[in-house]
Amino acid sequence: MKNIIKDTLILFAITLVAGLGLGLVYNVTANSRAMQEEKTKIEAYNTVMPGLGSFDNVSFDSVAADIYIKEQINKNETEKTIKSYNATIDEVIKAKDKSGNDLGYIITVTDNEAYGGSLQMTVGIKDDGTVMGISFLSLSETPGLGMKAKDDDFMSQFSNKKVDFFKYTKSEAKADNEINAISSATITSNAVTNGLNCAIYCVDFITGGGK
């Protein structure tokens, strides 16, 4: 009987120590992941808004913004785009330079219509509506196809452009708001374009377009 109790206590102690060890490892790993995600986000902020010194979160009526965004989609975009549209605004921040002067807005947006399921990116937009650029926080597309969305040849098409909305084309882009789709990856091209347009419409809403 004593041996059974002893063995039970030993087993309990081992289980307890193992559980505490796993919990500690999880917490350390979780903290490490959180730090890496924050680092990636800050790097993205600086990429899409050169000269960034500080930033503040922007509070806005997300319900009213969503209504406004959908109105703009219905007004500006094709029936095919409207039916597939599945983008959401995750975060909006106001960007300032090191002297405290306003630079514009940085929007984090997720689009759930990518070939790999979803993509998340940041978009830098100046106060006058000029898109400064995009940077991906997560992108799980097909290597050699949709992953080319990270290539400069594709991403640079969105830089320093002031347009009401973007659209992709499978032929040569001619208008200012047209971008060349990634060859054999129009689903990814569509997801990126829709996510970016969502960000443009959101900034327009915040700066007075929705009033």
Short names for language-model regions:
Residues 2-211:
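Flexible, solvent-exposed loop/hinge segments and secondary-structure transition points
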